Amino acid sequence: MMGVVSLPRVIGKQVYGSLYECDTTVLGEQKVLEQIVRKAAEEGNMTLLDVKAWKIGDGVSIVAIVLESHITIHTWPEYNFATVDVYSCGSHTDPRKAFLYIVKELKARRYTMNEADRSSEF
């Protein structure tokens, strides 16, 4: 009987989208957004390595480096708008759960959510 040959596989799960009509009191608060991205990593079962944040005009850009890849949030309080990207190379992670946690915390009244399978077999 022949054994099954498994090919090397790279896992890639990406969830990204736009958040509209968000709570403006949160969108400009760097420290609050840092806490949100930290908790989002936990919600998505990701291993947080570092968080960097920059105040840009009234908005904030947050980049969380997780062992499995990254989480980003970019905000525009003047438009009640944010974009979010959660990408993971870990089969044990749930980027969708992390994304939806951010949607909830930014109190988005509506949002788009896109999911991409960026996995590859070699």
Swiss-Prot record:
Binds 1 pyruvoyl group covalently per subunit. Pfam families: AdoMet_dc. Keywords: Autocatalytic cleavage, Decarboxylase, Lyase, Polyamine biosynthesis, Pyruvate, S-adenosyl-L-methionine, Schiff base, Spermidine biosynthesis, Zymogen. The record marks E68, S69 as: Cleavage (non-hydrolytic). GO terms for biological process: spermidine biosynthetic process. The modification Pyruvic acid (Ser) is found at S69. It is an enzyme of class 4 (lyase). Its cofactor is pyruvate. Catalyzes the decarboxylation of S-adenosylmethionine to S-adenosylmethioninamine (dcAdoMet), the propylamine donor required for the synthesis of the polyamines spermine and spermidine from the diamine putrescine. NCBIfam families: SAM_DCase_Bsu (TIGR03330). This is S-adenosylmethionine decarboxylase proenzyme. The gene is speH.
